Amino acid sequence: MLNIFRLRLGALLHFLIAIGHLICLFFLEEAFKAYGILDEMKHLCFGQEWLLFVVTVCLAVGFAIAGLYALSVAGDLRKLPLRRMVMIVIVGLYSIRVIVGIDWLLYEFTYLQFFSTLVPALLVYCYLPGLK
């Protein structure tokens, strides 16, 4: 029962993150500035402003799909393909994100970076039952 709650919580967090990314579309440049990644994102998108929006929408879709997989593993949705592999990838990617985030925090602590590391750590905790 606790494992199902954890998976549902992880799904909820992913849906909230996806909605947050979509909301950021209205002030995308300011959001990138707040995270200090504006120059990196512009370089990544070859200076094409419209690609920043496409990347953000794709990220939102990816977060929503991750939430759907958590609900599928919890038994709330039909079984999606490659559930176990997708759960392993999600936990693996977020584990790497947590390790990198801790390294950044040791270098320069900011509350934004702290919460940007805490949320992936919580998602790893929520998605671990899906590996069984």
Sequence positions of predicted segments:
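Cytosolic juxtamembrane helix and N-cap/initiation of the first transmembrane helix
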Residues: 1-18
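C-terminal TM-helix exit segments that contain a strictly Trp-centered aromatic cap at the helix terminus
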Residues: 19-29, 96-105
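Interfacial loop at the N-terminal end of multi-pass membrane proteins
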Residues: 20-55
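Core segments of transmembrane alpha-helices
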Residues: 55-69, 119-121
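Juxtamembrane helix-break-helix junctions at the cytosolic face
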Residues: 67-84
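Hydrophobic alpha-helical membrane segments
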Residues: 85-101
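Membrane-helix boundary connector in multi-pass membrane proteins
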Residues: 99-114, 131-132
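Membrane-water interface at the C-terminal end of transmembrane alpha helices
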Residues: 121-132
